[in-house]
From Swiss-Prot:
InterPro entries the UniProt entry points to: Class_I_gatase-like (IPR029062), PRibForGlyAmidine_synth_PurQ (IPR010075)
Reaction(s) the record says it catalyses: N(2)-formyl-N(1)-(5-phospho-beta-D-ribosyl)glycinamide + L-glutamine + ATP + H2O = 2-formamido-N(1)-(5-O-phospho-beta-D-ribosyl)acetamidine + L-glutamate + ADP + phosphate + H(+); L-glutamine + H2O = L-glutamate + NH4(+)
Residues annotated as the enzyme's active site: C96, H217, E219
Annotated GO CC locations: cytoplasm
Alphabetized NCBIfam families for the sequence: FGAM_synth_I (TIGR01737)
Superkingdom, natural source: Bacteria
Keyword Transport: no
Enzyme Commission number(s): 6.3.5.3, 3.5.1.2
Highest classification ranks of the organism: Bacteria, Bacillati, Chloroflexota, Dehalococcoidia, Dehalococcoidales
Name of protein: Phosphoribosylformylglycinamidine synthase subunit PurQ
Residues in Glutamine amidotransferase type-1 domain copies: 6-255
Task performed by this protein: Part of the phosphoribosylformylglycinamidine synthase complex involved in the purines biosynthetic pathway. Catalyzes the ATP-dependent conversion of formylglycinamide ribonucleotide (FGAR) and glutamine to yield formylglycinamidine ribonucleotide (FGAM) and glutamate. The FGAM synthase complex is composed of three subunits. PurQ produces an ammonia molecule by converting glutamine to glutamate. PurL transfers the ammonia molecule to FGAR to form FGAM in an ATP-dependent manner.
Length: 255
């Protein structure tokens, strides 16, 4: 397949859709922003795409909890269609608020029919965390999005990023990325782990490796110039986040 199309899902309160669209276009995909109401009216539109993105933001104002309203809409009205999309080889990524929604639908860690198993809740600091973080990628993960990546340096911006679940569930997660300190050491204290999330987990995937979600924002660092200290630190032209999107597009193109 030469042409790849990515659906950028929008809801009231989504505010990272433009950056996510730009990241996928930079990676070689065509994109289309589709409002949730349009998708609810015509779920068959999913068949037009190879990748589906749940961007960051504050969907529905997070009034009932981060990602909760969107999760209910997806689970109750789009669940079967999304399952078919995934079964046909489609890729799904959730970023920040998108991660929260995917967790609350049960899509992650999955399967959706088993319901919600984990949650993302208030940061230990009790405040909104907006900072740059160092991440290590699990070399044993099956995640399509992170193949060939060892380390990442990405920003976070969230108030509810603390991953919680029973020890049994947490230990079985397909954990993909972890918070570390600057030297790559895990189990580092705040602010290296900005939310206080269990086992330093910053992102997970389903068993197939084709559904991936993370709290940091890769779409906010696809060019070196997006970093506030780009000239001073002599950062390369390509930001760390871009590889996540190019991996997805490359994989979708081969299907």
């Amino acid at each position: 397949m030469s042409k790849v199309k990515t659906l950028i899902l929008r809801t009231p309160g989504t505010n990272c859709d433009i950056e996510t669209s730009y990241a996928f276009e930079l990676a070689g995909s065509e994109t289309e922003m589709v409002h949730i109401n349009e998708l609810l009216a015509k779920p068959s539109r999913l068949a037009e795409f190879q990748i589906m993105a749940f961007p960051g933001g504050f969907g529905y104002g997070d009034d009932l909890g981060a990602g909760r309203v969107l999760a209910n809409e997806v689970r109750l009205k789009l669940g079967e269609k999304i399952n078919r999309f995934h079964e046909s080889g489609g890729l799904i990524i959730g970023i920040c608020n998108g991660f929260q929604a995917l967790v609350k639908t049960g899509i992650l860690p999955g399967p959706m029919k088993d319901g919600q198993k984990i949650t993302l809740t208030e940061n230990n600091s009790g405040r909104f965390e907006c900072r740059w973080t160092y991440l290590a990628v699990n070399p044993f993960s099956t995640c399509v999005f992170t193949q060939g990546i060892d380390r990442l340096y990405l920003p976070v911006a969230h108030g509810e990023g603390k991953l919680l679940g029973s020890p049994e569930v947490i230990n079985k997660l397909n954990s993909v990325v972890y918070y570390t300190d600057k030297d790559g050491k895990r189990n580092s204290p705040y602010p290296a782990n900005p939310a206080g999330t269990l086992m330093d987990i910053a992102g997970i995937a389903d068993e197939s490796g084709r559904i991936f979600a993370l709290m940091p924002h890769p779409e906010r660092f696809v060019r070196g110039s997006q970093h506030p200290r780009w000239p001073a630190e002599g950062l390369k032209e390509e930001g760390d986040g871009l590889k996540i999107f190019t991996n997805a597009v490359k994989w979708a193109r081969q299907v």
